[in-house]
Structure formats: C-alpha cells, structure tokens
C-alpha cells in the first residue's frame, strides 16, 4: 500500500527509549543536545516579534511564487549588510517555509530519479530523509580532521559519477563547525566545471563565527551554479516563524533558467503565507539583538568546556570555527550509542553519539553550545567524571 521511499525504520532507537524512561522517572536530565533556541532561555521581545505579524496588508492575498518583493528585498539587505554581497537581485531569491523545503525544491530541479548528490560526511542526518522523498541517491565524501577539518578532494573526485548532479556543502558544517575555506571554494568551483554539477550550500549557521569575523557567503559565488540556502530559524533564532530561502547565483544563463524552473515549482505549492513575509524585515533585523547573546553563550560554554578538559586529558574537543555545536573526542572503549545510553541512565546527561552524524569511527560525542550555561557546566562535569570512571 505504501511507497518504498517511505519505508523507514520507524521504531524508536535504544537511546530514545532510554531517554523516555529517564524522563518518566522524574529525574533531572542535563540535556546537552538542545537545538531549539526558544527552549534554551534565549528569546526576543515578544511584543516586537508578534507585533510584526499584525499588518493590514496580510488581509489581501497576493500569490507571488518567488515570494513578496518586500521580503525578498529584506533578505538582499541582510546579505549586503552582514556579508557584503552587494549585487544580489531579489529575482535571484525563492522564499520557502524551511530549508528542508528549499532542499526539496533544488533536488527536484536538478535530479531525475536515482541521480546522485554528493554529501559531506560527517554531517546532517536529515539529508537521508530529504533524498528518499525526492528519489535521489546520496553519495558521501569525507571531511578529514588534521588540526581542523578539510574536504578530502581526492575522495570527492572518486565519489563523482556521470549521475552526479550537485555537491552539498554545509557552511559551517553541522556538527564539525568548519567553514569552507577560500581555497576549497576555488577547488569546488573547478570540480563543478569538470563534472557539470551545481553547489547546494546550507548557510543556516553562517553568522555564528566564534571569532566574530564575518565569513563570506556563497550567495556571491558566480563561478558555478550555486544554490545558497538559509533562513531566520538560526539567523534570528526564530524557528517557529517559518521563513527560509534559496539564492541562485552563478553563470547568468544558468541562473535565469534555474530561477524560471524554481518559480514553477514554488508556484505549484505556494507554501508561503502573507503575515510572515510582511514581517520579514523586522524578523531579519532582530538578528542584531539575538546573535550577540547567542555568541556570548557559545563562547562562554566553549571556554567552560576547555577549562574542565584540563583536568581530563583522556578527552579532547575538536577544533570548531562556528555554529552551535562542538565535537568531543572520548576513549573509544565502546560504541558511541552505548556510551550515550549509559550516560543517560547513570549520570542523567543527554548527548548525541557521533554515529548519528556518520563520524568515521567510535569515540565521538556531539554537544550543543547553546545549552543554558548552568546546565552545560554541570552536564560536562558529570560527563567527564563518568568517562573517567
């Protein structure tokens, strides 16, 4: 009765079952996996956020497949102001309700069934579901760690085939927190020319460079057909206000044809609503209030982790440049999932095992840096004591 593309293993995994049991017991859990800023004690002024939704213009229905010009202009202003992309035209944008929807639009644009998308490893578990729903095959290429993360270009070229349609980049990567360097960008553009592929670049964490130095956006990349995905879920810590987008850049003719086809896809669904689009200028401007708060927390939690690690030499953290996560390296005496389960049962600490993100082996735990500082400090202390024991 049901399609093969939705034939997923739907039963809860062991870690989820243990988490449910520990919660049911009433014991306090030190959750180091928090990804929702609205549950991390970080909030914008509700009067400003909700007030932006009260706009008489929203009573009029004006279906624009690419999105209302007011919203697209606000996104262009964000790129000019935050990332010095000065020549972005609103017509290069397609608004979506989420980056997941944006991925599905781009996959449908580029791929026939069983075509291939090259995806970094480690990275988002979400890609597998998005690929399944679009009948696309994922082929991984590794990021290698050597005093920081780099793309393994030898493996990228080996992974490519005549069915390759695009390379996914996450800039900065989740969970490694590594940005794509200028040298890597040049090499990726050359790869795209060699294989007639596009770049799909997820920049949801772009603004969260831990050193405070703005990183360049691929929205200004003109050397290969590039689809840059982002949204206010992370930029303004507003995941509940569904606004994301695709920026198409690259060779002029390819950009024009891609935009025309994306417009038809967007017109087929017309998923954007008027109140959110009209509020886009206010929502994007709120990043100026929330990002400094989040960056202070990211840095404080990272500093606290480093201080505690001084007393636990068996554990180390991997270098991280940006984003909301950090990777902890622990002795690989058991599987990451088994360790995460025992941490929950015996220390009430919740972490993500590395295999959730396709790390190359055991001994990796992924921690959220937006966790409230008191919870983070105590959770790390419990984790390190448990591993040491």
Q: What are the language-model segments listed below?
A:
Residues 154-157, 342-351, 357-389:
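PLP-dependent enzyme catalytic core of the Aspartate aminotransferase-like
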Residues 25, 134, 194-195, 347:
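Helix C-cap/helix->beta junction micro-motif
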Residues 88-90, 319-324, 362:
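Short Gly/Ser/Thr- and Asp/Glu-enriched loop/turn motifs at secondary-structure junctions
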Residues 2-98, 105, 155, 283-286, ...:
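N-terminal small-domain helix-loop-helix segment of the aminotransferase-like
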Residues 281, 297-306, 316-330:
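Conserved glycine-rich beta-strand-loop-beta hairpin in the small C-terminal domain of fold type I
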Residues 220, 224-299, 307, 387:
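Conserved core segment of the aminotransferase class I/II
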């Amino acid at each position: 009765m049901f399609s093969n593309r939705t034939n997923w293993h739907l039963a809860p995994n062991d870690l989820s079952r243990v988490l449910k049991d520990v919660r049911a017991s009433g014991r306090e859990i030190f959750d180091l996996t928090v990804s929702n800023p609205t549950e991390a004690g970080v909030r914008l002024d509700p009067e400003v956020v909700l007030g932006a939704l009260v706009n008489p213009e929203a009573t009029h229905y004006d279906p624009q497949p690419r999105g209302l010009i007011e919203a697209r202009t606000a996104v262009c202003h964000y790129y000019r102001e935050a990332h010095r992309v000065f020549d972005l035209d609103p017509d290069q944008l397609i608004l979506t309700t989420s980056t997941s929807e944006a991925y599905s639009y781009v996959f449908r644009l580029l791929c026939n069934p069983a075509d291939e998308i090259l995806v970094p490893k480690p990275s988002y578990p979400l890609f597998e579901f998005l690929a399944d729903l679009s009948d696309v095959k994922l082929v991984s290429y590794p990021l290698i760690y050597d005093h920081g993360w780099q793309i393994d270009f030898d493996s990228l070229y080996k992974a490519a085939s005549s069915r390759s349609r695009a390379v996914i980049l996450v800039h900065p990567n989740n969970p490694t927190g590594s940005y794509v360097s200028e040298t890597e960008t040049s090499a990726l553009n050359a790869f795209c020319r060699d294989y007639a592929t596009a770049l799909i670049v997820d920049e949801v964490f772009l603004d969260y460079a831990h050193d405070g130095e703005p990183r360049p956006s691929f929205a200004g990349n003109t050397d290969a057909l590039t689809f840059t995905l982002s949204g206010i879920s992370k930029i303004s810590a507003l995941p509940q206000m569904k606004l994301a987008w695709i920026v198409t850049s690259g060779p002029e003719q390819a950009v024009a044809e891609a935009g025309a086809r994306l417009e038809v896809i967007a017109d087929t669904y017309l998923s954007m609503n008027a109140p959110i689009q009209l509020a886009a200028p206010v929502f994007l401007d709120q990043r100026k209030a929330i990002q400094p708060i989040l960056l202070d927390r990211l840095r404080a939690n990272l500093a606290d982790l480093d201080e505690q690690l001084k007393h636990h030499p068996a554990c180390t953290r991997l270098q991280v440049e940006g984003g909301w996560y950090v990777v902890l390296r622990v002795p690989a005496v058991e599987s990451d999932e088994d360790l995460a389960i025992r941490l929950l049962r015996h220390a009430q600490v919740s972490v993500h095992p590395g295999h959730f993100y396709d790390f190359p082996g055991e001994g990796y735990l992924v921690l959220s840096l937006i966790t409230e500082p008191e919870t983070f400090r105590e959770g790390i202390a419990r984790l390190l004591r448990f591993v040491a024991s």
